[in-house]
């Protein structure tokens, strides 16, 4: 701290001395010209001019023990002055003069006699009360003011108006985090157990490196956290800082680059210099893709400064001098654009993928965020976790926050299941538009449209189940149907993809069958279905004509759509792709048409129920499909308990394990009798036509499913989308992270 203050003082003093020197030089050479209006003459010269009758008037004023004499000539006089080097300047004309004389009676009498002789007006003034100090202040005050303004301007120049001082803009903005203020611990990070285990080693190494050093292990140079937005990468870094108890420097990738050339590299050097002084320590760079993008991709010299900063970062992380005792943690959701030199071992030794949580992870995340929220007895967090596949931690936190806001708006003391259900709909499709005026024909069109999605989803239900269908307008959607996967999926099979496309086509097929017309309400359905079909052909190798080849990936497709790249295949191949996409879409449309034609009665029942009740849940939909009636109301329909603590969950797990062990032991003792008395219990379900009896496994990894399953950017295994039936230009109203919920409009 003292070094920084000394450096600041030296820099400030340097600029002040430069300013004073410049003023001295100007005064040294040109100060002689200041007398061009009033000529300063000797007393003898004054007496001589007064005797020659060249003086018009005179003023005499006591000042500091002498008399100050000022006056004016009768005619302008030509004078030439010289500067401090004796060099004469140009001649000037003057009419005023000034001089001093001794404060005695003889000099005063002499001047008075000469003035009376030539009729010169003499004026006597009182002595100045301010004295010489006021005079000095009048001359010095403007100089001091100018120096102060100059100092303030230079102090603000470093950071564009920031709080740093002169020449301090090359210093890093990262400051060691205060461990007392950071309350985040690993226990606050749920749903990422494997990721935490990888980081536990880093924390233990920083606390006690002897266990690792004894085995010849070295401390990792860097840890890269990559994954979709909202999965908790920054929260993990905060938890590491809270657990490690070592100096933690946090900075954003964009903070390295400023308007001045070389500032980024200077800040990198200063950051690592501070971290090494406080070693062992951790440096966390959030959004490192802002400074770590691959070099050589810029056009012209627009990226030279960023590349210079990246080069300095590469050297600091693993250069000639090494980087002992400093661990670099970085977070990004665009690891594909990072420079290969930054990703190699020795710089980022460990790459941790922070993915989307599974159903258990979502339940754990919900429990963490529900700690400070009073939940009613009918809230089942496990059920909510099942209903939110694809949601990340940020989405789940937002879901509970929306539910709490709704409960407060309704003047409730607790957050109940109705609040959470409404919050889920708001997050997926936006707020409800109950007051929107919809004419009778459009309302019927929306009802039969959504019933078409529902019927196809009920028939092709090997992998997905219909969770909810509604015709209440939300956002830009006139209605929507939510299809949930039976369990978390990481892959998508060809059969599953075709079933999803058929479900999306169910709305248009129902409109054509019932009304013999087409509306714009299916536009969003076509958008999703086309994306799935195109991904099947160009990315997943599910086309017999084109075979198992990858013709484009998500990045190439985005660049081509923005006009920044050329197609990677010929025009003939492009025509084949279009033909295959059209064929798959037409097959899905025909499948949906056949299913609705063969289930016209159930389709009508569900549509009429939607017109009456507006929203149907899973139990009501299944009852209408199987029995043709709405289910009876049950007060204990949703039995649930409050969110369990860790110890309660552990005891419950032990109890279930004990019961399971006892049942297995009993089965072994009575194997013969149990074989005769075992009753096969099966749920009575209708016989639904399907393509095969095989289980619906999926064959696309989570990084590719975003194109196949939703209009969102993030990598998922299915989709959430809404479209407004009967409303043109309907757009998806879903967050990019909850793609596992198939909401078809």
Swiss-Prot record:
<dbReference type="GO" id="GO:0005524">
    <property type="term" value="F:ATP binding"/>
</dbReference>
<keyword id="KW-0645">Protease</keyword>
<keyword id="KW-0479">Metal-binding</keyword>
<keyword id="KW-0482">Metalloprotease</keyword>
<comment type="function">
    <text>Acts as a processive, ATP-dependent zinc metallopeptidase for both cytoplasmic and membrane proteins. Plays a role in the quality control of integral membrane proteins.</text>
</comment>
<feature type="topological domain" description="Cytoplasmic">
    <location>
        <begin position="153"/>
        <end position="745"/>
    </location>
</feature>
<feature type="compositionally biased region" description="Basic and acidic residues">
    <location>
        <begin position="630"/>
        <end position="673"/>
    </location>
</feature>
<feature type="compositionally biased region" description="Polar residues">
    <location>
        <begin position="705"/>
        <end position="745"/>
    </location>
</feature>
<dbReference type="GO" id="GO:0005886">
    <property type="term" value="C:plasma membrane"/>
</dbReference>
<dbReference type="GO" id="GO:0004176">
    <property type="term" value="F:ATP-dependent peptidase activity"/>
</dbReference>
<feature type="transmembrane region" description="Helical">
    <location>
        <begin position="12"/>
        <end position="32"/>
    </location>
</feature>
<dbReference type="Pfam" id="PF01434">
    <property type="entry name" value="Peptidase_M41"/>
</dbReference>
<feature type="binding site">
    <location>
        <position position="449"/>
    </location>
    <ligand>
        <name>Zn(2+)</name>
    </ligand>
</feature>
<feature type="binding site">
    <location>
        <position position="525"/>
    </location>
    <ligand>
        <name>Zn(2+)</name>
    </ligand>
</feature>
<dbReference type="Pfam" id="PF00004">
    <property type="entry name" value="AAA"/>
</dbReference>
<dbReference type="InterPro" id="IPR003960">
    <property type="entry name" value="ATPase_AAA_CS"/>
</dbReference>
<dbReference type="InterPro" id="IPR011546">
    <property type="entry name" value="Pept_M41_FtsH_extracell"/>
</dbReference>
<feature type="transmembrane region" description="Helical">
    <location>
        <begin position="132"/>
        <end position="152"/>
    </location>
</feature>
<dbReference type="InterPro" id="IPR041569">
    <property type="entry name" value="AAA_lid_3"/>
</dbReference>
<dbReference type="InterPro" id="IPR005936">
    <property type="entry name" value="FtsH"/>
</dbReference>
<dbReference type="Pfam" id="PF17862">
    <property type="entry name" value="AAA_lid_3"/>
</dbReference>
<feature type="topological domain" description="Cytoplasmic">
    <location>
        <begin position="1"/>
        <end position="11"/>
    </location>
</feature>
<feature type="binding site">
    <location>
        <position position="453"/>
    </location>
    <ligand>
        <name>Zn(2+)</name>
    </ligand>
</feature>
<keyword id="KW-0472">Membrane</keyword>
<keyword id="KW-0378">Hydrolase</keyword>
<feature type="topological domain" description="Extracellular">
    <location>
        <begin position="33"/>
        <end position="131"/>
    </location>
</feature>
<dbReference type="GO" id="GO:0016887">
    <property type="term" value="F:ATP hydrolysis activity"/>
</dbReference>
<dbReference type="GO" id="GO:0030163">
    <property type="term" value="P:protein catabolic process"/>
</dbReference>
<keyword id="KW-0547">Nucleotide-binding</keyword>
<keyword id="KW-1133">Transmembrane helix</keyword>
<dbReference type="GO" id="GO:0004222">
    <property type="term" value="F:metalloendopeptidase activity"/>
</dbReference>
<dbReference type="Pfam" id="PF06480">
    <property type="entry name" value="FtsH_ext"/>
</dbReference>
<dbReference type="InterPro" id="IPR003593">
    <property type="entry name" value="AAA+_ATPase"/>
</dbReference>
<feature type="region of interest" description="Disordered">
    <location>
        <begin position="630"/>
        <end position="745"/>
    </location>
</feature>
<feature type="active site">
    <location>
        <position position="450"/>
    </location>
</feature>
<dbReference type="InterPro" id="IPR000642">
    <property type="entry name" value="Peptidase_M41"/>
</dbReference>
<comment type="similarity">
    <text>In the central section; belongs to the AAA ATPase family.</text>
</comment>
<dbReference type="GO" id="GO:0008270">
    <property type="term" value="F:zinc ion binding"/>
</dbReference>
<dbReference type="InterPro" id="IPR003959">
    <property type="entry name" value="ATPase_AAA_core"/>
</dbReference>
<dbReference type="GO" id="GO:0006508">
    <property type="term" value="P:proteolysis"/>
</dbReference>
<dbReference type="InterPro" id="IPR037219">
    <property type="entry name" value="Peptidase_M41-like"/>
</dbReference>
<keyword id="KW-0862">Zinc</keyword>
């Amino acid at each position: 701290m003292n070094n920084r203050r000394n450096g600041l003082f030296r820099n400030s003093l340097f600029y002040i001395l430069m300013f004073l020197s410049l003023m001295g030089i100007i005064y040294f050479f040109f100060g002689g010209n200041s007398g061009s209006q009033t000529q300063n003459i000797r007393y003898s010269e004054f007496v001589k001019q007064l005797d020659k009758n060249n003086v018009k008037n005179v003023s005499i004023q006591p000042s500091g023990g002498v008399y100050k004499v000022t006056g004016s000539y009768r005619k302008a006089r030509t004078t030439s002055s010289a500067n401090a080097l004796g060099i004469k300047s140009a001649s000037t004309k003057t009419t005023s003069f000034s001089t001093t004389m001794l404060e005695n009676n003889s000099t005063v009498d002499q001047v008075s006699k000469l003035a009376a002789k030539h009729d010169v007006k003499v004026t006597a003034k009182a002595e100045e009360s301010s004295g010489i100090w006021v005079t000095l202040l009048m001359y010095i005050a403007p100089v001091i003011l100018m120096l102060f303004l100059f100092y303030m301007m230079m102090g603000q120049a470093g950071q564009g108006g920031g709080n740093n001082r002169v020449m301090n803009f090359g210093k890093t903005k990262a400051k060691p985090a205060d461990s007392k203020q950071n309350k985040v611990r690993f226990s606050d990070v749920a749903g990422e157990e494997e990721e935490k285990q990888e980081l536990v080693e880093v924390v233990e190494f920083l606390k006690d490196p002897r266990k690792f050093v004894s085995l010849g292990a070295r401390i990792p140079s860097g840890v890269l956290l990559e994954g979709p937005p909202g999965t908790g990468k920054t929260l993990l870094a905060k938890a590491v800082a809270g657990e490690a108890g070592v100096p933690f420097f946090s900075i954003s990738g964009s903070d390295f680059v400023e308007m001045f050339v070389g500032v980024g590299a200077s800040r990198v050097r200063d950051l690592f210099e501070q971290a090494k002084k406080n070693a062992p320590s951790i440096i966390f760079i959030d959004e490192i893709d802002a400074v770590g993008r691959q070099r050589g991709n810029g056009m012209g010299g627009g990226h030279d400064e960023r590349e210079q900063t990246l080069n300095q970062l590469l050297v600091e992380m693993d250069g000639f001098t090494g980087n002992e005792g400093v661990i670099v943690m970085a977070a990004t959701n665009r690891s594909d654009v990072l420079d290969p030199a930054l990703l190699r071992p020795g710089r980022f030794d460990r790459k941790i993928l922070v993915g989307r949580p599974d159903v258990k992870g979502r339940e754990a995340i919900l429990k963490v965020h529900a700690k400070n929220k009073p939940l009613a007895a009918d809230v089942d967090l496990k059920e909510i976790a099942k209903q939110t596949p694809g949601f990340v931690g940020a989405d789940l936190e937002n879901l509970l926050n929306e539910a709490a806001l709704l409960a407060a708006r309704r003047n409730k003391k607790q957050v109940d299941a109705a609040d959470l259900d409404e919050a889920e709909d708001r997050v997926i499709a936006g707020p409800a538009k109950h007051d929107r005026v919809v004419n009778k024909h459009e309302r019927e069109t929306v009802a039969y449209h959504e019933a078409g999605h529902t019927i196809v989803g009920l028939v092709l239900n090997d992998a997905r189940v219909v969770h909810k269908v509604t015709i209440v307008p939300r956002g830009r959607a006139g209605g929507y149907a939510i299809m949930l996967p039976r369990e978390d999926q990481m892959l998508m099979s060809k059969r599953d993809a075709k079933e999803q496309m058929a479900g999306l086509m169910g709305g248009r097929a129902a409109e054509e069958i019932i009304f013999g017309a087409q509306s714009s309400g299916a536009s969003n359905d076509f958008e999703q279905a086309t994306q799935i079909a195109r991904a099947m052909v160009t990315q997943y190798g599910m086309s017999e004509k084109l075979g198992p080849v990858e013709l484009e990936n998500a990045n190439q497709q985005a660049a081509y759509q923005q006009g920044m790249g050329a197609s990677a295949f010929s025009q003939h191949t492009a025509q084949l792709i279009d033909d295959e996409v059209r064929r798959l879409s037409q097959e899905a449309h025909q499948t949906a048409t056949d299913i609705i034609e063969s289930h016209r009665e159930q389709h009508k029942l569900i549509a009429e129920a939607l017109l009456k009740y507006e929203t149907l849940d899973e139990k009501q939909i299944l009852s209408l499909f199987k029995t043709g009636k709405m289910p009876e109301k049950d007060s204990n329909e949703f039995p649930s308990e409050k969110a369990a603590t860790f110890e309660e969950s552990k005891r419950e797990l032990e109890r279930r394990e004990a019961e399971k062990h006892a049942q297995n032991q009993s089965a072994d003792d009575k194997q013969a009798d149990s074989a005769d008395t075992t009753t096969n219990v099966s749920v009575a379900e209708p016989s639904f036509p399907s393509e095969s009896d095989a289980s619906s496994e999926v064959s696309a990894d989570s990084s590719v499913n975003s194109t196949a399953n939703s209009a969102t950017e993030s990598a998922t295994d299915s989709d959430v989308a809404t479209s407004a039936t009967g409303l043109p230009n309907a757009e998806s109203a879903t967050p990019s992270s909850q793609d596992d919920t198939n909401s078809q409009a």
